[in-house]
Structure formats: C-alpha cells, structure tokens
Amino acid sequence: MTLIDVSNGAKGQSTNFTDPEETPKTIADHVAFARDFLQPFGCDVWKVNMGARPAEGTSADQLKRVADTLNEIGRQTIEMGIRLAPHPHVWGPVEREHEVRAMLDMTDPDYVWFTPDTGQLTLGGLDAVQIMTDYLPRIAEVHLKDTYAKYRGNTETPTREQHAEASVYHNLGGGGVDFPAVMKLLRDQHFKGWVMLDVDGPREGDDGFDAIGGNLDLAVDDYLAHNVNYLRVVLGVKLPPLD
C-alpha cells in the first residue's frame, strides 16, 4: 500500500511553529513521523498545518520562525523523498496574504512546497487564483474547498465564534471561490499533482442540512452527490458514476 498524502497533527506531535521554546520539538516530532510512518509507506507529499494563531496576530519574527522551522523540517524530509507542503489555514499563524507570501518567499523551494486550499485562502482575504498563479511551481497538491459568496474579497477573516454559530464553509458552488478559473489555471499549466475535494460535514445551520430537514444521513448523501456532480458537470472532471 502507498499513501498519497498525510496531514500532521498526530497524537503528541507538536505543531507549534512560532514559539522558540517549542519549535525544536516540532522539528524533531515531524522528522521522526516522516521517517517512521510516511517513508515506509512511500508517501511523497506531506501537507502540514502550522498550529494556532498567536493571540495578537503573527509578528514578523514569528513568521521568520515559521519559515525557518519549515525549512529545517523540509531539508530533512526531502532526503527521504517527502515534499513538505504547508497548508495556510484561517486561525493559524499563516492566514493573511502577506503571511502566505512571506512564508513562501522565506522558505527554500528545494525544501518547502505549498498546499493551497481555495476556501481557506479566500477566507483569509486572498484571491486564490492569483496566489496559485504566482506560486504555481511550488504547489504540491490543491484542496478544493468553498465558502459563502459574502466572504469573497473580504478584508477580515471570520472568527472562530462566527464559525461556531454558522459554518463559514459551503458546498462547491457557494460563490466564494472561482472554481472554473482555478481549474483553467491547473489545466492550462498542465498541473500534475493531486487535486482533492475538501468538504466539511453537514451541521445544523448549513444550507444543505436545514433544507433536508435536519436528517444527518440524508444530508451527508446530499453533500456528497452535490459536490461530485459539481466536479463532473460544472468543472468537467472525469469521475465514475456516483452509486
């Protein structure tokens, strides 16, 4: 069996990329996980989140520490044939456009790649198509995720409290992300990496969940059918029939 991709965050694994007291353990934990788990299963892409966002936002020094930590992990994992691909995420230390660009500009492209998540980038105030265009050679894989149209071009990231009240995520076609433009970019540039559907499960307050009367089983089936059909019909992705 070969693993296509794995995320970090295993039990006991440090994911603190900003605290100088914690980053040595973060490096050691990640290198050990790559050596003991990813490499034996032939996994060659490792998507990593970078922990929680500092309470006052991410400072320039903390961004530099994130980049240095990624560089050191990536320097060691590439020797194992594993490409380290950080995943900017709202509520993480790398969230806003200047932070994403700084992370990529301060990391060595021989050691550190990029996992753009279209929904997370949009929620962070970025134009997902533009940032993917600018850093296309660094992209290891792509996560297709959507949000509501009201967050497109937003200047502020929605809070965790807002997300707790009502999910900031949406099925594909919610209007937050220009998916036809995303797919055109990838096709025009002959992107050869993995493109993954990233969907959060239905919950009370979501459009699809409430429309189906709050039946979780039906909502899950409806979510899957909606997103698979969007990929197939709207984006022209060749997929097997949905049974």
Where are these regions (language model features)?
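Aromatic-lined substrate-binding rim segments of carbohydrate-active enzymes
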Residues: 1-2
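Active-site beta-loop-alpha junctions enriched in small/polar residues
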Residues: 6-11, 51-53, 89-91, 117-121, ...
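Short amphipathic alpha-helical segments, especially helix-boundary/capping motifs
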Residues: 8-12, 46-50, 74-79, 156-161, ...
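Short secondary-structure boundary/hinge segments and terminal tails
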Residues: 12-14, 55-56, 95, 152, ...
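The substrate-binding groove and active-site-proximal loops of carbohydrate-active enzymes
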Residues: 14-25, 168-174
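Active-site acidic/histidine proton-transfer and metal-coordination neighborhood
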Residues: 17-114, 215-222, 241
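Histidine-acidic metal/acid-base catalytic patches
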Residues: 35, 97-112, 116, 122-243
